[in-house]
């Protein structure tokens, strides 16, 4: 029997309610599965609440725990828009080099959706592309200098706008980061019985950045003759996903495209309330819901826990506790399909008086394992 350690980041807003629900469900799945291992939890804080007491949204003790434990389950945390502290998610990804964002998108009977046969996985590169954060604000001398330098060095393409009114973002795409994310996608496909990996780009326009990603993906795909590899342009990919999502299996993309497409695919499957996720690297694996912290519902025992519990399913599979993971996912699916012990957003009408709370839905899932 394996003995695992895991960090539980309780988050803020509705995070503590969801963290408790997911932790109890993961424990129950292990307890009820013969031969399954155990998990010892290290409870840590991150986000707005700890920022107010410690002056940082991500204490060093939390980062160290993520490094030292076998996996991390993270509840939602608040990210201020436009002002305030940096995103905790970005801090974790950059500090620990969690280079792969994994977003399974799967439809479950009972979840309102236009599609009933979604079962695909989005793999997003986490560390570079336009999200590298290398930006130059309009009106600054260094921005004008950058534009002047680009115009001087480029023989045929010029920045045609006024430097004083132009902001610039840099889009780095490297061989090393492209190779490891594409290889991650193919390895994931092989380990999980997936048959196809689609690598997505806009190389017809951005020939030296997306073109590089495409070249690397084509080369890496040759190392996996048992997995079909194919390419798509990002705009065509979006149309194809809306028209024929059943044709796709594992999709791997650079950072910006991956951010957009992962939410698109979550929408195909019913929304962020049923969308789990993970950020994985050589220094840690963080499993999390992809929705926000909903501060207005803090402490109200109201919000749907499905996404974070499904993230717990992903964590169990990462820990090689597959029978327990399957048992928990089957229990989630059964509760959703029955439609009785579900939160307000999963009822046919959001004001349905029979809707249950976060805690009660978790109780129903535990009973169904």
Residue ranges and their predicted role:
Residues 7-24, 28-29, 33, 145-232:
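Glycine-rich phosphate/diphosphate-binding loop of Rossmann-like nucleotide-binding domains
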Residues 12-15, 70, 123, 185, ...:
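Buried hydrophobic positions in well-ordered alpha/beta secondary-structure cores of metabolic enzymes
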Residues 34-59, 241:
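N-terminal beta-loop-helix "entrance" segment that forms/cooperates
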Residues 35-40, 192-201, 224-232, 321-329, ...:
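Flexible, glycine/charged-enriched surface loops at secondary-structure junctions
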Residues 48-50, 240-341:
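Glycine-rich phosphate/nucleotide-binding loop
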Residues 50-157, 167-169, 256:
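N-terminal glycine-rich phosphate/adenylate-binding segment common to multiple enzyme folds
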Residues 232-239:
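Short acidic loop-to-helix transition motifs that present clustered carboxylates
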Residues 354-369:
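Phosphate-binding loop/pocket of nucleotide- and phosphate-handling active sites
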């Amino acid at each position: 029997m394996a003995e695992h350690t895991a960090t539980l980041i309780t988050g803020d807003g509705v995070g503590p309610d969801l963290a408790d629900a997911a932790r109890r469900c993961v424990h129950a799945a292990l307890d009820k599965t013969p031969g399954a291992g155990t998990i010892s939890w290290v409870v840590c804080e991150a986000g707005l609440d700890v920022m107010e007491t410690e002056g940082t949204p991500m204490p060093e003790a939390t980062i160290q725990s993520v490094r030292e434990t076998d996996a991390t389950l993270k509840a939602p945390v608040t990210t201020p828009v436009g002002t305030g502290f940096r995103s905790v998610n970005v801090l974790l990804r950059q500090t620990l080099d969690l280079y792969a964002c994994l977003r399974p998108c799967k439809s479950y009977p009972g979840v309102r959706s236009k599609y009933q046969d979604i079962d695909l996985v989005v793999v997003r590169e986490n560390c570079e592309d336009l999200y590298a954060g290398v930006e130059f604000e309009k009106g600054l001398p260094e921005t004008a200098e950058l534009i002047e330098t680009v115009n001087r060095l480029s023989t045929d393409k010029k920045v045609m706008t006024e430097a004083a009114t132009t902001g610039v973002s840099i889009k780095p795409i490297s061989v090393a980061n492209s190779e490891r994310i594409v290889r991650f996608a193919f390895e994931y496909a092989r380990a999980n019985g997936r048959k196809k990996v689609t690598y997505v780009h806009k190389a017809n326009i951005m020939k030296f950045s997306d073109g590089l990603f495409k070249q690397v993906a084509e080369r890496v795909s040759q190392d996996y003759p048992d997995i079909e590899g194919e390419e798509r342009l990002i705009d065509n990919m979006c149309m194809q996903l809306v028209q024929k999502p059943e044709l796709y299996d594992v999709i791997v993309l650079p950072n910006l495209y991956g951010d957009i497409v992962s939410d698109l695919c979550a929408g195909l499957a019913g929304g962020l309330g049923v969308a789990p996720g993970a950020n994985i690297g050589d220094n840690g694996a963080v499993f999390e819901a992809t929705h926000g912290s909903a501060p207005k519902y803090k402490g109200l025992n109201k919000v749907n826990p499905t996404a974070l519990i499904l993230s717990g399913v992903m964590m169990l599979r990462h820990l090689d506790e597959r029978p327990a993971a399957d048992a928990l996912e089957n229990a989630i699916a059964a509760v959703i399909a029955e439609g009785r012990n579900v939160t307000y957003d999963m009822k046919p009408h959001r004001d349905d008086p029979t809707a249950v709370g976060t805690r009660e839905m978790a109780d129903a899932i535990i009973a169904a394992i």
